[in-house]
């Protein structure tokens, strides 16, 4: 979530009789970071041809998405009936695994979103300057195509005079029998 602490407190107030302060909620968030329950993904700020402002708010993820599933008391059937929620937990799972792989390569995983709504779920960036753009989707041809189009739009905005082109663009999906390379990149 990119929600501010204030927004989280306001959401909690609508669902709970016991209100907490923004300061207290911020303290809880910091405690959850320290005990490795949540982790922030920083915003990626590439050199773009466009003057569109890049949003720089961190995205907060559970270290292990099963924590969120357990807190909400959800089971497999609940997730299958609510694919939007399932998609959020799937994205968290994928980001966690991408972080493990990136760390082994001395890299980091970021996210990207600009004011126009163009976003990239994960940017795997290595210390040598190479990077890859990743869209995460549960699956289905329509969503895969949307993800690929989104990555193309972002790649076209990157100022390749100031930084390299992406080393790869990937739509990471939860369904399908195999990986394949598309003709559009």
What function would you assign to each model-found segment?
Residues 125, 131-142:
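Active-site ExK catalytic segment of metal-dependent nucleases
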Residues 67, 116, 140-141, 176-178:
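Conserved nucleotide-binding/hydrolysis micro-motifs of P-loop NTPases
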Residues 174-185:
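Domain-level recognition of nuclease-like catalytic cores that cleave nucleotide substrates
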Residues 165-174:
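Short, hydrophobic beta-strand segments that form beta-sheet elements in well-ordered domains
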Residues 74, 146-147, 182-184:
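Short amphipathic alpha-helical segments
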Residues 1-130:
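Accessory nucleic acid-recognition modules appended to NTPase machines
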Residues 139-160:
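Mg2+/Mn2+-dependent nuclease catalytic core
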């Amino acid at each position: 979530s990119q929600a501010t602490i204030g927004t989280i407190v306001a959401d909690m107030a609508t669902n709970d009789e016991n209100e907490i302060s923004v300061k207290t909620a911020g303290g809880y968030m910091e405690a959850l970071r320290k005990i490795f329950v949540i982790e922030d993904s920083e915003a990626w700020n590439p050199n773009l041809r466009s003057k569109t402002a890049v949003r720089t708010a961190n995205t907060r993820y559970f270290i292990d998405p099963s924590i969120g599933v357990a807190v909400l008391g959800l089971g497999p059937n609940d997730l299958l009936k609510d694919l939007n929620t399932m998609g959020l937990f799937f994205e968290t799972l994928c980001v966690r695994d991408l972080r493990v792989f990136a760390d082994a390569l001395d890299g980091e995983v970021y996210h990207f979103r600009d004011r126009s709504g163009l976003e990239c779920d994960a940017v795997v960036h290595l210390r040598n300057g190479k990077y890859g753009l990743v869209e995460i989707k549960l699956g289905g041809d329509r969503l895969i195509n949307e993800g690929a189009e989104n990555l193309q739009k972002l790649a076209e905005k990157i100022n390749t005079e100031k930084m390299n082109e992406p080393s790869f663009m990937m739509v990471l999906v939860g369904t399908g029998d195999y990986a394949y390379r598309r003709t559009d990149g």
